[in-house]
Amino acid sequence: LTSTLSGADVLVKGRGDIETIASRSVLTNNGDIVLWSNSDNSGGGSIVLGNDNVLNSSNGRSGDTDSGGGKITLGGGSGYGTIPTGYSSSSTGAGIKLGTSTANHTEIYSGGGDISIKGSSTATGQVDDRDESGIYQWGRMTMKSGRGAITMQGTSGEYQGIGFTAPLTESDTGVKQLSMVSSKTSGTAIQLTGSSSAGVGVSFNYLHPEEVLSLGGGQVTINGTGVGTYGIDIQNLDVLSSSGDINMYGGTGGVNVKDRGVRFGSRLGSSLTSSSADLLVCGDDLEYNDLAFGFSNSLESTG
C-alpha cells in the first residue's frame, strides 16, 4: 500500500481488528501512517502485523537522523480527526502483535515523525501466554524515528505489558533482535511504559542482544509496573544515550537484570561510543544476577 503524493496520509480504520498478511509494506511520501482498530470504542479490536511488514512514512528513507517524515500511529478506541488516542485492545489475544512468528523482521521507519504504539489485552487462558500481552514483538524488529520520538504503551491483565522479543534462534551474540533508535534532540526521545496485573510490566526477553538508543540528546524512560513479579525484566540489553537522561522505573516490583547484563550510557563498538547521560534506576527491589562469562553490567558516561 503506497501513497506517492507528498504529505498524503494513509489511514486504515476499522471498528474491530486490523490484520495484515506477511511481506507487506505501507509507504508514504512523508505523510502519516495510521492503523486504527476498535474505532467505535466498543467491543475491542486488536492490530496484528504479519511477518516481515514494513511501515515507512519517510519516502523510503531509513537513516538514524532523518527529519520531515510523517507520524506512524498504531492504536485504537477514541480519537480525534484521523488519530486514535486510545489503545488497540483485545480480550482474546494480544492488543498489538508485531509479527506472528519467530521468523519475522518488523521494520518501522518514520524519518522524523513521531512513532506511537498503544496496545492493551485482557485475554486469559491462551495456549501461548504471549498472546495475553498488551504489545508483543515476535522475531526481530528495527524501529527508527529519526528526529522524532518513540512512544510505546502496553497493558495486560495476565502477562507482559510490553514484551521484547521472541527470536528465531536463541543466541547471546550476533544481530540485534531489537534495535530501537531515536535522534530527537530534546525532551523525551524514547518512552516505554508497560503495566500488568499479573506479570512483568516491560520485559526484554531471552538471550539475544537488544538495543535502545538515543543518539540526539533526548531522554530515554522505561517505566514498568508488575504485580507479583518485576516491573522491568532485562536480559542482554544496551540502553545508550548521547546526553539525555536514562530513567528506569520498576515500581514496587523493581528491576531485574539477568545473567547477560545491561550496558548504560555508551559502549565501544556500538553507535554510541561516548556519553554524558545521567542514569536513574529506581524500584523497591533491584536484582542483579550473577553474570555469564564475557558479559557485564556497566555505565560508561561522563554524566
Label for each model-derived stretch:
Residues S298-G303:
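Short, intrinsically disordered, charge-balanced linker/junction segments flanking boundaries
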Residues L1-S6, G16-L27, D32-V34, S39-L49, ...:
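Extracellular beta-strand scaffolds
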